[in-house]
Amino acid sequence: ELAKKAGAKGIRFYGICCSGLSAMYRYAGVIPLSNAVSAELVLGTGALDLWIADVQDVFPSIMEVAKCFQTTVITTSESARLPGAERFEYDHHHSNIGETRELAERIVKRAIESFENRKGVPVYIPPYEVDAEVGFSVEYVHKRFGSMAPLAEAVKSGKILGIVNMVGCNNP
């Protein structure tokens, strides 16, 4: 409701990086866009109103790209502190887990404020999409297909053109 009052169609959540992204995609509808190595490219579309970094890898250059597109950057952990980012403290060891809902509400409100402040910022979203199956492991392939054989056959026959291994924590 708050987002619609601000003129937005709604709120969408996207994921960039590693920790838990496949589970967030599969069970919570968080759409994966990239890993940390190409995160600046995603931010460079101008389409993101708020960028939040928790304990995952994030490069300091993200702040320079965010400035170009007036994107708000929030960090929630000691390991992802960035000069110029807003700080919303959350302990990944769960000492303040009781504050999770309140923190999430603050972040959503801040995203809506950022949306309002960014009106007029140029946005370029490439005109294509790619269907992908993400977050699979050997165990997942066995559960989904019964064995590795159907996957191997689909690759050999050309039904699947390739497999991309986009893993987290591949940063230098």
Region spans (language model):
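Metallocofactor- and cofactor-centric catalytic cores in central/energy metabolism, strongly enriched
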Residues: 1-172
